Amino acid sequence: MKLRPLGRLLAAGWLLVASIAAWPQGDKVYAQHCSACHQPDGSGTVGLAPALKGEHWQKLSQDRTYLPLVVLKGLAGRITVNAQTFVGSMPPWAEQISDADMAELLTHVQALQGIANGVPYRAEEIAALRTKPGSPMSSLQLRQGILGAK
């Protein structure tokens, strides 16, 4: 069957809309839930929220569960990031962000950290971590264990 010009245009438009819908949404989820405190580029806010990039992430990214557990379960206590000390808490986002959106968000944060060839997070991976017990304090303990800090 031969498509007429209008048919071709409609088919092309449908394909464009379908492909846009399939684009990763991590940057949008990040903008909605994270950028107010951590800034759009992940540079953080002095005295409020630490940077999501810097030398500490080279170690933290070695434990693939760290970042999702912090976002799912929260983090509370004293941490030092890029020579700045933060004392506070980040709320858990498990109730507000779906597994699929969380996977996209975490993959976006990897990109902010310069982990261009990082393995993208998957919704199934987030779902499995969501069932694990955890709390803001357990996220702090995990962080301390990875970084070798007290």
Outline where the language-model segments fall.
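N-terminal signal peptide c-region/cleavage motif recognized by signal peptidases
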Residues: 17-21
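Boundary at the C-terminal end of the N-terminal hydrophobic targeting segment
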Residues: 22-26
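The canonical Cys-X-X-Cys-His
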Residues: 30-40, 90, 105
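Protein kinase-like catalytic domain
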Residues: 38, 72-75, 113
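Gly/Gly-Pro-rich "capping" loops immediately C-terminal to redox-active cysteine motifs
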Residues: 43-80, 87-98
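Flexible coil segments in periplasmic/lumen-exposed cytochrome c-class electron-transfer proteins
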Residues: 88, 97-150
